[in-house]
């Protein structure tokens, strides 16, 4: 989880043309040189920005917390979504869309898709 998150958050600071080389370098560093265990499967849960913002607001209200410095920067979040999609394509992650026809998919539908992907990978 940390390497994949790192690819997105650190990658968001780079020009798009440099991303493929950065993605390759990061995986080589963390999985090759540092010897971290390489995941057998990565699921990228693709959520649009308005839904992501709504979920963050709900979490903040529910737990009486404030947005961190990154969560307050909507442009940064939007860029991370874009970089996440590029990273998913580069690395071959399995993308699970959380949206369908402009609305969030039902929980059961998302659950079934994720469970099916995991079951197939076992």
Predicted regions located by residue number:
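NTP-dependent small-molecule kinase module
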Residues: 50-122
């Amino acid at each position: 989880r940390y390497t994949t998150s790192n690819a997105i958050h650190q990658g968001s600071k780079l020009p798009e043309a440099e991303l493929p080389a950065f993605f390759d370098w990061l995986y080589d560093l963390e999985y090759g040189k540092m010897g971290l265990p390489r995941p057998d499967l990565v699921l990228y849960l693709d959520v649009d920005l308005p839904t992501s913002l709504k979920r963050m607001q709900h979490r903040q209200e529910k737990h009486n917390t404030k947005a961190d410095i990154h969560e307050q920067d909507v442009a940064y979040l939007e860029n991370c979504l874009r970089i996440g999609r590029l990273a998913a394509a580069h690395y071959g992650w399995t993308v699970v869309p959380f949206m369908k026809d402009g609305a969030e998919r039902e929980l059961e539908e998302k659950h079934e898709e994720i469970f099916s992907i995991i079951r197939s990978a076992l």
